[in-house]
Amino acid sequence: MALTRPVRLFSLVTRLLLAPRRGLTVRSPDEPLPVVRIPVALQRQLEQRQSRRRNLPRPVLVRPGPLLVSARRPELNQPARLTLGRWERAPLASQGWKSRRARRDHFSIERAQQEAPAVRKLSSKGSFADLGLEPRVLHALQEAAPEVVQPTTVQSSTIPSLLRGRHVVCAAETGSGKTLSYLLPLLQRLLGQPSLDSLPIPAPRGLVLVPSRELAQQVRAVAQPLGRSLGLLVRDLEGGHGMRRIRLQLSRQPSADVLVATPGALWKALKSRLISLEQLSFLVLDEADTLLDESFLELVDYILEKSHIAEGPADLEDPFNPKAQLVLVGATFPEGVGQLLNKVASPDAVTTITSSKLHCIMPHVKQTFLRLKGADKVAELVHILKHRDRAERTGPSGTVLVFCNSSSTVNWLGYILDDHKIQHLRLQGQMPALMRVGIFQSFQKSSRDILLCTDIASRGLDSTGVELVVNYDFPPTLQDYIHRAGRVGRVGSEVPGTVISFVTHPWDVSLVQKIELAARRRRSLPGLASSVKEPLPQAT
């Protein structure tokens, strides 16, 4: 037994040595054996590094010339001379922003032109006299606003249609001069009509309906100097002070020829029979997209029912049986405008006027988007407010609007700025009416350079002195973004204007991607154009 074990072991070794091995080649006796000088694991690491270097992107050649979109990564820049096709897909700078790894990324939509679209194509020969305005109205305009010399594009299209007695839907970008486009024809029409004092309660002949007290004060401030020169009395009717204040406002004598009112206050006055709309000759819904929202729609419907809207221009000829001419004005319009007009007027009597840049990204305003974590927003805002780069300013120093999505955020952020010794004003809808009075006027007079506010300050308010808009909370809709961004770059602004938006949530990123794609294609923002261009339904 002891001798058999070595024999078996020897036979096993012989089999292993004589058996062919996979992957081995027979070498000649003179061929040297390979020598391993680098460990196999280290050699694999070197090969992986070399493959990574080969796969690195090639350096981007930056071509000279202005940019339309400038991103942190140069390969995502888009030159100003390039426009994407409607169906052409392109890598977006915000493509991966829903990932946490995208934090601190940023891109900007640069200025494509220096002038606002509303004044860029003005003819040197155009004037308000060419639009059909009477000399008395032209003289009043010269006295009230001597800086207004030429009509804007919107005014040149709107004023003649209103003078012909047409109902008008005017949809144009913010800051394009829409207020004067309806005030001047309104006042001229009232000059040619007698005042009927047959009612024991106030009965204005012109009504301008606006969504907020601040906007009512602003429109009244524009209309009063014009009316004073023409012998017409302009007053406002605001809510928030109770019925006693409404009765006091309406009891003032003589009664107003033109009334600028908010829906809530006017609805209360109509319900209490403190005012009549039977002699109305002109009805304007300013910021109509807001007035047709669910929060105001029931009130506006009631006001329209109490107004005698003319079916066409022929109904406006009888001065002793007054009918109202209807005007809807706004920078954006919701769906259903046609259905609303069909309830009160003939579709054939309505003229729709839209500007070429309606619902488009403003080409003369720089817009920057920052992808931030929620906890970093306060530090970034404080840095922006304390270190605004004055070297880039081409004009006088402007003011800053900081938008938040809720009143509580405005208050909380105000305490933070107080801790940093940053002087500011606050404006939000939950403030008592007595506190809100005069806040925006103080901001316009530059008593403070910074205003923290909600969207109450984004609708229609004149802000020609605003240089910077900061969206601390990104707006929930594209309509809100258009209105907020429209606080800068307005007609008559002395500063070019910039918008900075903090992007935090995934739903914010979805809106930013729509904005970026529209800017790269130079097209209007999606989901807005159809609400204005839809045909009016035929009466049944």
From Swiss-Prot:
SUPFAM superfamilies, alphabetized: P-loop containing nucleoside triphosphate hydrolases
Pfam families linked to this entry: DEAD (PF00270), Helicase_C (PF00271)
Residues engaged in binding ATP: A172, E173, T174, G175, S176, G177, K178, T179
Protein name per the record: Probable ATP-dependent RNA helicase DDX28
Residue ranges annotated as motif Nuclear localization signal: 520-523
Cross-referenced PROSITE patterns: HELICASE_ATP_BIND_1, HELICASE_CTER, Q_MOTIF
Short motif Mitochondrial targeting signal, span: 3-18
The protein's Enzyme Commission number: 3.6.4.13
Organism: Homo sapiens (Human)
ATP-binding recorded as keyword: yes
Top-rank lineage group of the source organism: Eukaryota
Gene name of the encoded protein: DDX28
Motif Q motif boundaries: 126-156
